[in-house]
Amino acid sequence: MASAGKPNIDDGRRGTSSPKLKGRDHAKDTLCRNVTIYGRCRYEDKGCVFNHDPSRVNDAQHPERSSSKKRFNVDSPSFTPSATPLNGSSGLKKSATISPKAANAAPFLPKGVLSRSNAATPQSQPETSTPEWSIGEIQDFVPQGFDTSHVESIHGHGNGVLSTPAYDPFVSSSTPLGASGAVTHQVQPNPYSHDPSAIGGAAFFGAHNAFQQPVQYHLYAPIGPHNQNILGYQRNIHDLFLPNSFREELQKKAAATLQTLPNSQLPTQIDYFHSLVPLDLSHQKNAAIFGYPSWVYKAQSSKDGNFYALRRLEGFRLTNEKAIRSVQNWKRVSCGSVVTVHDAFTNRSFQDSSLIFVTDYHPLSKTLAEQHLADGQGRYQGRHTSGHIPEQILWSYVTQIANALKAIHSAGLAARVIEPSKILLTGKNRIRLNACGILDVVQFDSQRPLADLQHQDLVNFGQLILTLGANSPSLMHNPTKATEHFNRSYSAQLNNSVYWLLSGMQKDQERTIDIFISGISSQLMSTFDSSLHLDDQLISDLSRELENARLVRLLTKLNFINERPEYEHDRQWSENGERYFLKLFRDYVFHQVDAQNAPVVDLGHVLTCLNKLDAGTDEKVTLISRDEQSCFIVSYKELKKAVEASFQALLKPARRI
């Protein structure tokens, strides 16, 4: 062993050197102790026979570690891929140390840059039986959907190198490369290639059996418009549920539609209609408008099952068949402000000759006379009058009736009946012209020019607005007083519009419904804006009721799974595994009892459990068997997974085994 003190290099008389093991040939595989102690041996070049390279000693002592050493070493001066030795010849032994030539090695260039440089300087490919790896032959990463024609020049086309199909991470590994036969083996998949499903590489991975959460239909998204007058922590009941007034209105309309009249004296069948229910509020006959007493009924059609309104003209005798054919023109009128006419026919089921008009049925609708007028006698006796009508509501009526007359006159027809008792109020400030086309049949023989009838519609329109604004059903008896009251109550624009309508029969200038609509365009925009706000509100209300059947679907799946009689003796299905604690969960939700062993009927508990199950929360629940010998602690997420898996097993029985 070398001396611990500092030796004198120039002293040639001292023969101290690295210890030598005479007679041992493996001294070259023994690490010199000077290297271990001092880090180097000063006698390495003066005859020391021991090994001064620790890496060679480790390779000699651990040959298995040397064989597993990575081929690509960061200490190597340049990247040189390994090739299979030809004819079984052994490859050259690589040096593990850094070569002095490493200082002159070329700088590292990315693959794309190097491939571009190769395109500029063609190189000849060595002629060997086995193709060698080339940087230019490897394609760059190109997502699916990207046009590869723009990057063909990068992959060696035109550089003198024969391009071979390279590895594509988006192609299944079972697909062989190319048809040239140069490479016959299959390329192994690259475990480091990133292939998110959003790029479209889902086909690269096989299907897996892991449980996937379904689309979260139970997560309701608040759809506008939103109320900006409340703070962030404040909530209204309308923000969570459908407004009670709207719900009650729809329920009442549904009940009125399905209403029947037992022990009725009405005919059981009129043509293809049945289940007649009278809609008139008075039993007094009134023939002032049509010339015949008229009655209105609700009936159900045997053809489509829908409900319609039947208006019967009592005692009418049809003398001209062409008169009833005029109803065909009214079938083509499609307007939201006109009650649609579907059919007209004569019938003797009421023990007389009656004319029946079939129109749409709007449940719980009122007439404008019932809503705003009360004369103290006749049909409207004792009804509450709303008094003065706000001008904005009156303008809403004007725009809707103008819309109806626009559609009717454009079809070459005339309404002829614009009366408060024949205009339906089907919703909040929502009106529709009713009983249109009846006078075309009743007064078919005494036809007037269409232009005169349309001008008369304008006059009747003005008289209607004046009657409603003055709150005077007897307008014709004292028109001056009604006009003065109307002028004092409403703006000049509304007064001028009504005066223009009342002058519809004058020949001093052209008067059409189109000219009238142009004059009230500002009010049309206001009404249109209100309809848009109502549309937004209805969409918001509908979004809250979009998935209100999700708990029913969940209950249906649970009932499909639990206690199936065909699997009663199949322990794999009913008494073991996930089906068993689904059965216990059913008892936990619906079959609880109190301290007195009485059934607990708690709808809130049922809804809470089902909502948590539908959401798949991480909250855990304790399930105990009926004999109290088994206890499970599971989460709602696991329960939801079990429900979906069991239901899919029912759809595909082969999975159950």
Curated annotation (Swiss-Prot):
Main location per the UniProt record: cytoplasm
Zinc finger residue extent: C3H1-type: 27-55
Record's compositionally biased regions (Basic and acidic residues): 52-67
Region (Knob domain): 561-657
GO biological process: mRNA processing; nuclear-transcribed mRNA poly(A) tail shortening
Annotated region (Pseudokinase domain), positions in chain: 259-521
Region of interest (Disordered), residue spans: 1-29, 52-98, 115-135
GO cellular component, one term: P-body
GO MF annotation terms: ATP binding; poly(A) binding; protein kinase activity; zinc ion binding
Amino acid composition bias (Polar residues), ranges on this chain: 75-98, 115-132
HAMAP family recorded: PAN3
Protein name: PAN2-PAN3 deadenylation complex subunit PAN3
Source organism of the structure: Coccidioides immitis (strain RS) (Valley fever fungus)
Gene name linked to the record: PAN3
